[in-house]
Amino acid sequence: MSILLVIPARYESSRFPGKPLAFFEDSNGKKISLIEKTWKLALKLNFIDKKIVATDDIRIKEFCESFGAEVCMTSKDLKNGSERVAEALKLQDERYDIIVNLQGDAPLTPIWVIEDLVKELIKSNNKVTTPILKCDQESLKKLIIDKNAGRVGATTVVFDKNLNALYFSKELIPHTRQSDLKSNKNFVYHHIGVYAYKAEALKLYNRLPQGFLEKQEGLEQLRFLENDINIKCVISSLRGNQFWELNNPSDIPIIEKILKKI
């Protein structure tokens, strides 16, 4: 099977304009942009046949080309990263069987998380897979802090007994009681913004209408669920590492703190 990896990157963002070009301090003490850190992660995935950045902004294109990334320009009218990845596939003459959508807001994603995601897609009848993490007390506390501060941050997910996603939300789901927090027991799973698609599912995505829930939550993956297409969740392990996403400028020091421990 041939595999394409696409990093969708847009400059305009209501919460964090210019996020792909945001800089933070890496584990070696040097400043690196979010998009270059994500590209370096992609380069470690040797089983991927081709890797590209898909953007609609010339600033991102020129910056990515400066560190050797291959870039394709996409329409400015696309609504989200999945639509951008689907257009990138079309620009590659649709000659790939599996497509990985590696969004640039998770530079701490371990490579084995992406490997496991693709393995699950290949061996199963699923059309879309995505990784999730059981929240530990520290990450759950950060989710609650973001919520109480009115920041739209990480995404949580609930799923059925077969690990098919039931719902994704920017709210904290399921409801977590104070007793759960105190006893170190919670059932909250953090969604990592990476997807693997069978080509036919991704091609279908741009033809599907945006549903109410997708618009309300601002979560692109809900388009699949609202159109009765399953998303298989793959429970991931950090193997002792820590994880956090870069959704807001306030996340930069959190990620830098984690990187200093690596």
Model-found features: residue ranges?
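Conserved core of the sugar-phosphate nucleotidyltransferase
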Residues: 109-208
